[in-house]
Amino acid sequence: MDSNTVSSFQVDCFLWHVRKRFADQELGDAPFLDRLRRDQKSLRGRGSTLGLDIETATRAGKQIVERILEEESDEALKMPASRYLTDMTLEEMSRDWFMLMPKQKVAGSLCIKMDQAIMDKTIILKANFSVIFDRLETLILLRAFTEEGAIVGEISPLPSLPGHTGEDVKNAIGVLIGGLEWNDNTVRVSETIQRFAWRSSDEDGRLPLPPNQKRKMARTIESEV
């Protein structure tokens, strides 16, 4: 059995115990108590699957947490603040652009747009977004630029459907890339997108997609809204 699986279960058991003590003092609100009940059922199921006693695991989890807290400084207990990363200038973000062959698709709370008239170009993706815990938190805007600076694609959040995950953004990037590469464009991404929004690119920043995936993604973006 993986040691991380065991220690994770042990810590979860102890933290549940702490939350239970908090609830016993009638300090928890309704959502807190609801999560407590659901997590209790989950821990019982995990304990049965792992063949571990919950009481024993709780004691072991307490030792792990105490050891961590002994090494923790007050500074480390502060909640990390979001960082705002910018590939684009204000002018690049606010510039109007037009499509000769407009295509767009709504994927969850994100809108993907591209000009399918663009062919045989080298295209760079740039984005402005916030990051927390070294992961993308909120996409502000992503745009695709030709080497000449023309905007040929875009991914933006829909104001009417707030909320998206890093995985949502990654999937949307895949759809945009697939559509652009279908027309024999070479697509590269900025370093910030590579690091926080698309972790599978190669050293040149190109987003390698096999031909069958390109075709699938190109078909996906065919539906106009």
UniProtKB/Swiss-Prot annotation:
Residues 1-73 are annotated as: RNA-binding and homodimerization. It is found in: Host nucleus; Host cytoplasm. Upon interferon induction, ISGylated via host HERC5; this results in the impairment of NS1 interaction with RNA targets due to its inability to form homodimers and to interact with host EIF2AK2/PKR. It comes from Influenza A virus (strain A/Hong Kong/212/2003 H5N1 genotype Z+). Gene3D superfamilies: Influenza virus non-structural protein, effector domain, S15/NS1, RNA-binding. HAMAP family: INFV_NS1 (MF_04066). A motif (Nuclear export signal) lies at residues 132-141. It comes from the Viruses. This is Non-structural protein 1. The gene is NS. Inhibits post-transcriptional processing of cellular pre-mRNA, by binding and inhibiting two cellular proteins that are required for the 3'-end processing of cellular pre-mRNAs: the 30 kDa cleavage and polyadenylation specificity factor/CPSF4 and the poly(A)-binding protein 2/PABPN1. In turn, unprocessed 3' end pre-mRNAs accumulate in the host nucleus and are no longer exported to the cytoplasm. Cellular protein synthesis is thereby shut off very early after virus infection. Residues 175-210 are annotated as: CPSF4-binding. GO terms for biological process: symbiont-mediated suppression of host cytoplasmic pattern recognition receptor signaling pathway via inhibition of RIG-I activity; symbiont-mediated suppression of host gene expression; symbiont-mediated suppression of host mRNA processing; symbiont-mediated suppression of host PKR/eIFalpha signaling; symbiont-mediated suppression of host type I interferon-mediated signaling pathway. A motif (Nuclear localization signal) lies at residues 34-38. One of its GO terms (molecular function) is protein serine/threonine kinase inhibitor activity. Residues 218-225 are annotated as: PABPN1-binding. Pfam families: Flu_NS1 (PF00600). Homodimer. Interacts with host TRIM25 (via coiled coil); this interaction specifically inhibits TRIM25 multimerization and TRIM25-mediated RIGI CARD ubiquitination. Interacts with human EIF2AK2/PKR, CPSF4, IVNS1ABP and PABPN1. The keyword Cytoplasm does not apply. The dsRNA-binding region is required for suppression of RNA silencing. Belongs to the influenza A viruses NS1 family. Keywords: Eukaryotic host gene expression shutoff by virus, Host cytoplasm, Host gene expression shutoff by virus, Host mRNA suppression by virus, Host nucleus, Host-virus interaction, Inhibition of host innate immune response by virus, Inhibition of host interferon signaling pathway by virus, Inhibition of host PKR by virus, Inhibition of host pre-mRNA processing by virus, Inhibition of host RIG-I by virus, Inhibition of host RLR pathway by virus, Interferon antiviral system evasion, RNA-binding, Ubl conjugation, Viral immunoevasion. Residues 204-225 are annotated as: Disordered.
